[in-house]
Amino acid sequence: MAKLVIVESPAKAKTIGKYLGDDYEVTASMGHIRDLPASQLGIDVEHGYAPQYISIKGKEKLIKELKSKAKHADGVLLATDPDREGEAISWHLANILGLDPHEPNRVTFDEITKKGVKEGMAHPRAIDEDLFNAQQARRVLDRLVGYKLSPFLWRKVRRGLSAGRVQSVAVRLIDDREKEIESFKPDEYWNVDATLGAGHKSFTARLATDASGKKLLPKSEAEARAIEKGLEGAEYAVAELKKGKRAKQPTPAFITSTLQQEASRRLGFTATRTMRAAQTLYEGVDIAGHGTMGLITYMRTDSLRISDEAVAAAKEYIAGAYGEAYICPYKRTWKTKSATAAQDAHEAIRPSVPSLTPDEVDKSISGDTAKLYRMIWSRFMASQMADCQQDTVSVTVSAADYRFKASGYTVTFDGFTVLYEEATDEKEKKETALPPLEQGQVLKLRDLKSEQKFTQPPARYTEATLIKALEENGIGRPSTYAPIITTIIDRGYVERDQKKLKPTLLGRAVDGLMLEQFPHIVDVDFSAEMEKNLDKVESGKADWHKTVDDFYQGFAASLEQAEKNMEGKKVKVPDEPSSEVCDLCGRPMVIKVGKYGKFLACSGFPECRGTKRLVKDTGGICPKCGKGRMLERKSAKGRIYYGCERYPDCDFMTWDTPVPTKCEKCGSTLFRKGSKLYCAKEGCGFEMPVPKKE
């Protein structure tokens, strides 16, 4: 009789089943099997916040099958994911199947490889009650906030709204940033740059100080021109030359937050898309010559630890592929930068078999999984490589009563950069190589240019920078970053605008109400403290009932007071204006949000019920008919697509984005797909890479 092993997904079951053989039957629970009821609170507030769990609708047949298999099996092992959610699934499975949670029937796999599965099976343990209680406390807290607060929002703002404990903080961060941008007053300044010749080569130095070392930054054109006049006929010479060496270190292997940030910057992935691909890589894919195997370690982690075995395997590969000089000569260790300590003892995200290169894997997988594996593999390998060595030079140039400065570097040993360098969110100050210079050397002025500039407001959050802010402030956990962003967008509180996150008018109205009536709920420090309290529950240092009660007593009092404060009042969400006019009555139309996104409605509602689909002119011309403009539209499910304005006379449509660049072959509108631009006009076939930004 075989032992029964239960995991979450069929893909994971297939991979593990291959390693365990015929003595085990591996089956899937298809995620959670029990949860709080959707139609009621499901928490007994008067009796220790006891959750009233029920079987998830549609899982009855599966539960019956699991019970039957467990009854006839020679033992049951629960092998769900090694985190809070996985522990909760195992706890509920044990409860339903009548297993003793104190018996060693729980196994976990940090990597789903032959070695990883063997290691996990060799160390069964009891269900971690503290880990489960941390998940249970989070679930109860989120239900209390959502179930109690949502009806308040229905009455005071709009029906159908909902609120969340962590999501509300994310909306606040985004709204606060928007307020900063709106209140920002730009200051004018001028850069004065001198292009200087040194022999046959030249470089650019920027005005920095006067002769006494006082910083100079002209605030007007008049100031800049006065400096230019003061430089007329001046001799430019090297006043100070500093040379040095520096070593640039690689970034550590990914944790969940940095994986999502880098995939957003480098690959353009949303956090949800990243985690979906990572889940596939962890659970197992079929690799030619290797069979079905998990390609990466567990992807929900905030630990930067790497096993000695993985480090040794990486260094062995590096020596063979790049040479001994490229191996880091010492053991690298990193300390987590997050506001809280690492959640568990997982490793960082790394390839489960370091010697399995992306080129080899690409023969068997493609698309998102291939791109993400290449990024994970490259980052991990680079983390074990030698530093990039650079010679640095900074020069101060004297000219009359002014001093100009420039700096640069040359790479003397590329080290880890031969394989991987981290992408950046913002434009960094560029350093370039300087020509050979000597102290006192007279330079030739080739150009003197003043350029007007203005200080810039802080940038809106992207998914990458929001995740970074959440992590740094201790808000949420590795498993929650992606759902937080998905939720606030789905609820209509935030929208994407050119990959930036912008609060909607609805989001701003709700955030304003929350800040006014429930300041502690949207307070960053308060939310971070709650995460620390949940960590204490997980480590057995706090009781989950008391943790919930401490929060709920204050929350319930705030809710009661808010009801009194808002009695007879309602928050009006302003309509977003548009340039469209109603075809029925001629009144201006406004932008409203419905079930499937934004649409145009007559401002005279309810007297006039005129509506239109909201379309956006992209500026491109249809490649099929050559007459109609390409319009941005939304499908019934809210997905953006592009179609000809002459529909239905012309039925051209595409999911790919039109761009301003025209086809070099026929002059038609080009469309972007991934990293290439292509012409969609029949018979043309022109393609080109997406131009790199300067």
List each model region and its residues.
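C-terminal or mid-to-C-terminal helical accessory/interaction module adjacent to the motor/catalytic core
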Residues: 112-194, 243-244
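Basic, low-complexity terminal or inter-domain segments flanking catalytic cores
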Residues: 2-4, 15, 150, 183, ...
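A short, conserved structural fragment
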Residues: 282-297, 491-500
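Short, hydrophobic-biased segments on the C-terminal half of alpha helices
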Residues: 275-279, 485-486
